[in-house]
Curated annotation (Swiss-Prot):
Name of protein: Pyrroline-5-carboxylate reductase
Keyword Amino-acid biosynthesis: yes
GO molecular function: pyrroline-5-carboxylate reductase activity
Function: Catalyzes the reduction of 1-pyrroline-5-carboxylate (PCA) to L-proline.
Family the entry assigns: Belongs to the pyrroline-5-carboxylate reductase family.
Subcellular location: Cytoplasm
Pathway, per record: Amino-acid biosynthesis; L-proline biosynthesis; L-proline from L-glutamate 5-semialdehyde: step 1/1
Top-tier EC class: oxidoreductase
Keywords from the named record: Amino-acid biosynthesis, Cytoplasm, NADP, Oxidoreductase, Proline biosynthesis
GO cellular component, as recorded: cytoplasm
Taxonomic superkingdom: Archaea
Cross-referenced InterPro entries: 6-PGluconate_DH-like_C_sf, NAD(P)-bd_dom_sf, P5C_Rdtase_cat_N, P5CR-like_CS, P5CR_dimer, Pyrroline-COOH_reductase
Organism: Methanobrevibacter smithii
PANTHER family linked: PYRROLINE-5-CARBOXYLATE REDUCTASE (PTHR11645), PYRROLINE-5-CARBOXYLATE REDUCTASE 3 (PTHR11645:SF53)
Amino acid sequence: MNLGIIGYGNIGELLSQNIISHDFCNLNKLYIANRTLSKINHLKDIDPRISITDDNIEVAKTCEKIIISVKTPDLAIVLDPLKPHITKNQQIIHTCAGTDLEFKDCGLSCVIPTISSTYDEDNPKKGVSIIMHDENVSGENREFVEKLFSKFSQIKVVDSPMDLEIATIAASCMPAFIALGVDLFAGELEEKCNLSKEETFKILAETLNSTAYILKEDIYSPDELINKVATKNGITQKGLDVLDKRPARYL
C-alpha cells in the first residue's frame, strides 16, 4: 500500500513526522507532495526512501491512500485535477474543517488533527483527532483512518457536521486559545511583581499541565478540584465568583 500526503503546511508536517516516527508504513511507500519542493527536500535527509514531489497527480496515480492537508479554500482546487486519476479502490482523507465537499467515487474522510499531537519521543500519543466519514467510505477505509490517527493521538469519531465543528473548536482551536490566555495572564502577573514574564509563564504553563493531568486521570472532578483549592471568602473563591457569573460562551 502506497500512502501519499499532499500539502506540507503545519498539519501536513505534523502528519508526516508522526507517520515517519511511528513506522506506520514502509517509507519506500510514502509519497509527500508540496507545491514548493524545497520545503520538503530535507525529508530525503531523514530517510532517502521517502518519495517527494511537487506533482499532486503523481501521488494520485501512485497511492492507494491519499491525505490532502491544505487550507480549506484550497481543497476543491487541489482535489479537482486529481479526480480523473482516482478510482473507487483508493481512499481520500482531508484535514479541512468547514467544508461540505462530496466525492462519491471513493468517499471522503475528514480528520481534524491538533497541533497538540506534534511528535514528542517522550510523549508520542497526545491530543485528540476529530474524524468524520461520509456515507461512501467503506468499513475497511474507516478502520484505516482511525488506526492511523490513533497511533499518535486519541480519536473521536463524529457523525454530523455540527458535531465536527464543535469538536474541532474543543480539540484543534483550543490550543491557540489556551496559549493566548496563558500569555496574557503571564503578562499581567509580570506587571504586578518582580518576576519576569518568562518566569510567570513557566509557572502558569506547569500549573496548566499538572491541572490537566489531574482532570484527565480523574484524580479529582472539576468540582472536587475547585473545592480543594478555594476557601470561603478567600481570594480564589472571589475570583471564581466573578468567573461563575459569566457563561462559558462569553469567556
